[in-house]
Structures are given as structure tokens and as C-alpha cells.
From Swiss-Prot:
Name of the molecule in the record: Chromosomal replication initiator protein DnaA
Natural source organism: Desulfatibacillum aliphaticivorans
MF terms in GO: ATP binding; DNA replication origin binding; lipid binding
The gene coding this protein: dnaA
Disulfide pairings: none
Gene3D superfamilies xrefs: 1.10.1750.10, 1.10.8.60, 3.30.300.180, P-loop containing nucleotide triphosphate hydrolases
Lineage of origin: Bacteria, Pseudomonadati, Thermodesulfobacteriota, Desulfobacteria, Desulfobacterales
Comment field on protein domains: Domain I is involved in oligomerization and binding regulators, domain II is flexibile and of varying length in different bacteria, domain III forms the AAA+ region, while domain IV binds dsDNA.
Span list, region Domain IV, binds dsDNA: 334-454
Amino acid sequence: MMTDSMRLVWEKAKEAIRSQVPDQGYLMWIDPLRVVKAAADSVVLGCPNPLAKKWLMDHYRGLLESAMQQAAQRPLKVLLEVAECVAEAPETPEEAPQQLCLPAFADIPRPSSGRLLNRDFTFDSFVVGDCNDFAYSAALSVASKRSKLHAPLYLLAQTGLGKSHLSQAVGRQVMQESPEERVFYITAEDFTNEMIGALNTGTISSFKEKYRRNCDTLILEDVHFLSGKNRTQDELAFTLDSLMETNKRLVFTSAYLPSEIPKMHDSMRSRLNAGVISSLEAPDFRMRMRILQRKANSAKIALPMDVAEFMASELTGDIRHLESGIKGLAARNSIMGRGIDLKMAREVVGNIVRNRKALTLGVITKMVCKYYRVTEEDLRSRSRKQAIARPRQVAMYLGRRYTDQSLQAIGRTFNRYHATALHAVGVVERHIRENGDMREPVLFLCGKIEAGEF
């Protein structure tokens, strides 16, 4: 039967997933899932409860679909429903449960090299306002087939303000308008690791050919990771020269201006400065209102005007705080069956901003030490053991995200340089993006901070 064969596919997919998520996360969220329904182009995975379903939707949606499609070797829609008792089910679903990924696999543009693009990051879904309209227009111009803008685009913004959204929107637009063009979407760390691998295996000529001759659009995230990477900077500089000479599209993202990135060669810095540098600022009140309404529509909840105004007034940080607010409302609305009103909004916002002013780097350090069972002296030591280095990196990341401390100040707190703190932030951000083994501890600590539990 179709369901039986799909169960074999699911077992194969689980093996692939297991290698990409921490053991604790796999046992808690992935292993309990069962195939309950299947059709030729879709599969329904049963979750034990609504909380598990919501967590999977928020954290593992892309990984589940990608693994199933690779295991089945065909386009598949992956759907979730709560099914405490898994029994034999009809092959064709009688009622469509909540869909995990809307378009079929074949309809998802895939870069020629590098990472998959987020399906939600399109120009249409980007909320435009005074804080980002130039960046939006510049990105749209770069992506257009009729663009006269041949200079590189450098998107500058702090975490959570939309630079990755725009960079990936460029990639999606290019692939949709010009499927024959080769789009490479990678991080600076990916480029570094690939280059090191090529050097170690004696394939550096193929590596150079790939990026200099077989690339039409290069989207390079987190260029600040290049700090102190002399060999990588040299190789990338030659690559950029080759691409710019042939008017290829170049998009860079960073939280820092080229002039602010330490240990960067002048030659590399000049190439990054050669294009259009466009910043994305924090949204103002009207912009936050629009974002909240857009997020509420996506979450399929009705957001009363007084609730939207209250949340827009209180959640003045990055856009992720607004997303957290909408998710909090949606969860309470769904699980508790309560209507969305100001009382609920105050509860949700309170969990996000409670005691924010009291949060210091010292408090964060104590939280991290308690979680990882290390001492503050350990974090300030010169030890590079993973059991010490990982917690230190997490503390630096949380300090950068939740306090107004500079990278220099954060580095000094742990007896490290500015560049080391910058590297730590980049490492943790990568683990969060890629479901690395630091992801769940970091998200847990973020949740504690945003709930005021520190």
C-alpha cells in the first residue's frame, strides 16, 4: 500500500535528519513522528500533540520536507496533523490538514550552488517603509533582467532587520526570471570552508573555475566572517575581480560597514566599498504596525487595532520581536481558545520585554554558566576546549543580541579581542540557521531571556 511504502521512505528520511540535528532534539521531536496518510504527491506525519506540531512548524519545517523529498526522489508535500494513536489510514487524505510547505518541490527555485533559499523571503512578502525603501529598490534593481545597476550591492543591517530576506529575494527573482542563470547563495564561512577543502584535496583549480567562470549571481552572506582570514580574502578578491569584469550580479550582507570589519585587507575592503552600500534601519511605529498586520495575516489570526497599536508601541526592537509577539498571540488563541484582546497582548509582550533593562552581560554570563555547568573563570580563561569555547561563544552572541555592549566590550569581558567576539556571533548565527547542535541551547536561553526568567 502507498502508506506502507511511504513509511519506508520516512525511515530513510529520519536517518538523514538524525545526522543534522542534536540527539536530544531528534529524540524529542523527530522520532515520535509517524506516517499516518500518504498519496502519490503528499505525506501526512502524525504528531503526538499540538505543541509538538507547532514546534516542528517553527523549527524543522524545511528540514522535514527536504529530507522526505530526497528520500522519495520526487516532489512531495509534507503535512502535519495531531494523531496521538497512529493507525492504518486511507491512502488519500479525506480532509487536508495544515500544509507544511505550500509549493511542490519542483516549484521551489534552487541555487546552482550553496544553500537553499527560504521560500518566504520574496520581494512581495517584504514590508517596505522609510527605514528600508532604498535597500529594497536597490535589491529589486539588481535582480531585474533589465537592470542597469552593475555595481555590487552591500546590504548593511543588524540582526533581524531584513538583509537576508532581501538578499534571498534577489536570488529567487533571478532564478524565476532567468532559470538558465547560475545563482550561488553562500555565507563567507561556506566560501572559506570550501576553499580550504579544495586546497587540502588539490582541487583549487576547480574551485576557482567554479566561482570565476560558472557563476552568474553570487550572494555572499556575513562577509564580516572574513575578518583575519587572509588566504580567503586573497582568493575572494580575485574572484570578485573576475565577476565584476563580466558584470555579474554581486550581493553582500553584513552587520558592519567594510571599514568597521577588523583585520580586513585594504584591497578586499576597497572591493566591498566599490558598490552600493544600503542600510536597513529599525522600523518606526507605522512600519511596525504594517509588519504586525502582515504577520497576523500569515498566522491566520485577526489582530484588533488596539492590540496592534499596543504591540507596535512596546516591541521596538528588531522584527523578530514582532514575530515573537504574533506567535505568542497565535499560540494562546489556539491552545487556550481565548479571543485576542489587550489583556492577552500584555501577557505576550510582558514575556518578551520583562526586565529587559535589568539584563546585563554579567547576568547573561551567569545564565550561560548555569546552563552549561561551567564557571565564569572558565569563560574568561584561555582554554579552547569545546566544553569551554562553546559556552563562551553563546555568551558573546547573547550579549551582542540582548545588550547594547559593543563587540570590543564583549570581547574584553572574556579576555578576547573584538575579532574573536565577531567570530563567535557568526558561529552561533550559523548554528541557528543550519539546525546545528548549538541551536536548541541558544533558543532555550533566548526564550528564558525573552520571558524575563533570568
